[in-house]
UniProtKB/Swiss-Prot annotation:
Record's protein name: Opsin Rh5
InterPro entries xrefs: GPCR_opsins (IPR050125), GPCR_Rhodpsn (IPR000276), GPCR_Rhodpsn_7TM (IPR017452), Opsin (IPR001760), Retinal_BS (IPR027430)
Gene transcribed to yield this protein: Rh5
Pfam short name (any one): 7tm_1
Expression sites (tissue/organ): Expressed specifically in the retina. Each Drosophila eye is composed of 800 facets or ommatidia. Each ommatidium contains 8 photoreceptor cells (R1-R8), the R1 to R6 cells are outer cells, while R7 and R8 are inner cells. Rh5 is expressed only in R8 photoreceptor cells in a subset of ommatidia.
Amino acid sequence: MHINGPSGPQAYVNDSLGDGSVFPMGHGYPAEYQHMVHAHWRGFREAPIYYHAGFYIAFIVLMLSSIFGNGLVIWIFSTSKSLRTPSNLLILNLAIFDLFMCTNMPHYLINATVGYIVGGDLGCDIYALNGGISGMGASITNAFIAFDRYKTISNPIDGRLSYGQIVLLILFTWLWATPFSVLPLFQIWGRYQPEGFLTTCSFDYLTNTDENRLFVRTIFVWSYVIPMTMILVSYYKLFTHVRVHEKMLAEQAKKMNVKSLSANANADNMSVELRIAKAALIIYMLFILAWTPYSVVALIGCFGEQQLITPFVSMLPCLACKSVSCLDPWVYATSHPKYRLELERRLPWLGIREKHATSGTSGGQESVASVSGDTLALSVQN
């Protein structure tokens, strides 16, 4: 909670200590690090110990989950010949970005233990730089995955991107993540500072200057609006294409007086259109879950009522991004048929059981007459 007295923000009594002491946020920072604490945070009492404990436990779980899930993706996709396809390089790149984000978690755990950013300005810059590169890189990689799926499924013969094209897209994802990560690092435009419980760092969205407002607007469009628009457009066009394709097949089957032209049609299978919609919705919602909280907090902090941005509220976006980086490998890769087959073969103790490829699919390619429901559900069987 945030209050203002006659002379400005005042600290709350830290009830968690039970001794009536008054401790504002940042009081535990060493004297040489006090300049890092934005005046906004000093208007709040120190967070209760159980808040820190809750986030501490959550970050440990997320860190272990991210290392395991993304580590499996990188290991399987990089060592399996059947998975070394152009499209799968994008999934591998996403796992690398997600694992890169995980490198911040040990730093956070140390910060939460001592109560301040270990390493001072340099430690804060490194933490925020890692988060910026991995976050913006993952967002644009998600957009390129959506674009690749649209190209592949809408035109399975000539629409597949080549190795060279995919490598260029991957290089572009790292270039895309660089400008708005490096500019605040050198304080050319924007800057990094502690946020929330003052144990994490991000770009400054609290300083009310015209220059900083322009920075927040620009990074919002760059890291959120553009990738989200690309994802939405790609999956909308993909969904539209599949719907038209299924309608055409249904009309042709009616003319030929047969039930269906799809090679894999049966009463137990979910319709292709529904599976496409479900997969697209999951992917799109994950992106929104990851970046909408940060966008909302940053926009409110820069243009709205800053008193709404409490330490607890500003910690939620950080938790959301870390959570999605752990979910990505399961959404993007665990539903990949050939990936599941590799897991079943190499790690049978995971209990994964995947239907083996049938003769109806040659080399993992979709037939011209039909599109595999599993392929459309999440990933082309490359």
